[in-house]
Amino acid sequence: MNTTQTLKGELLAAIQINLVKADYEGEVNKALKDYQHKATLPGFRQGKVPFAMIKKMYGQSVLLEKINQKVSEALNNHIIENKLNIIGYPLPELGKEPNDLDNQEEISFYFEAALKPDINVNLKDHQIDDFNIKASEDEIDRTIKSIQDNNKVEEQVAELNEELFDKIFPGQEVKDIETFRTKVAVEMEKQYKAEAERMFYNRAIDKLVDEIKFDLADEFLKRWIVENSEGKISAEDVEKNYEFGYVKSLRWQLIEEALVKQNPDLVLKEEEIRDFVRSMYFGHMDLSTMDDETKERLDNIIDAIIKDEKQRENINNQLADKKLATYLRENMTVNVVDTNYDGFVKAVLPQVEMPEAKETDEDKAE
């Protein structure tokens, strides 16, 4: 068996695997003899079916199985030994499929594999706005109006008095409308900050994907997406949505990998995961006052949560996104913009241009 590789440009590897009969013939015969020992057919005792009959019945399927095993092993070993950094997995090269496997002394298999590009990210080269959102007087008015509507008594809008103030902010000694407005503004701005932080991460991803340029083996990847979908995605779908759908997420994945490679601290550590779970589920508890037995029970619960595969994946994704969002905020060139919520929405959401109204016959008549 012999494996060779050539490059089709910088981003596509062509891998050729040559097999001769000696590479697989012994294993094929051994597998067929195992079938022979176990086979029971009418007119023959177990293990006495002629080998030629067994070969006629099972030879082709066993041959394909053993050849596929050898080719897969050779392909995987080649990727590992040569440290190929590939996207997805290799695909057979079109137009070079082997045939008539029974009657060839040597068989060649041809594969293609997309190589990951080298990406170096300098986050300081990328500028992004971050928003410090303050509640405007109009926004506070609208929120208070909503509070009054949501606390109607017998269809009567709730009055702005101490009863309502205490209902919304119990135990906080809110006695007058100005203090109430201040409290409302503080709560609004907490929500604004959380939303701005969520939006920052998504906007940062979009910006980096748009600004960090690198080539990909696009034609191969289009084919790979179709093959990997197992019939769920057509070539037409991929062609239509490739640039702004499929490849956008791939580009971010490659940029994220480059960031983690450049900054190993972004790799999740087990203790970070445990602390994250502890905060998520038990953050309201004062752990410093707990006895050892209670702490042990909490640790056992955390162990159970982390061992659950789906929960572990969800937690890892949340924590990785949180760490990366913080890293982007700290290392990109950030321009802080003071604004109100309406200004924030206009700045970060795509603005839809309304079509001009067509002049009607009635308009013309006027």
Name what the model sees in each region.
Residues 2-67, 127-366:
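Extended, charged alpha-helical "arm"/coiled-coil substrate-binding scaffolds
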Residues 54, 71, 75, 89, ...:
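Single-stranded nucleic acid-binding proteins centered on OB/S1-type folds
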Residues 119-127:
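Contiguous, non-catalytic segments that form substrate-binding/exosite surfaces or channel walls
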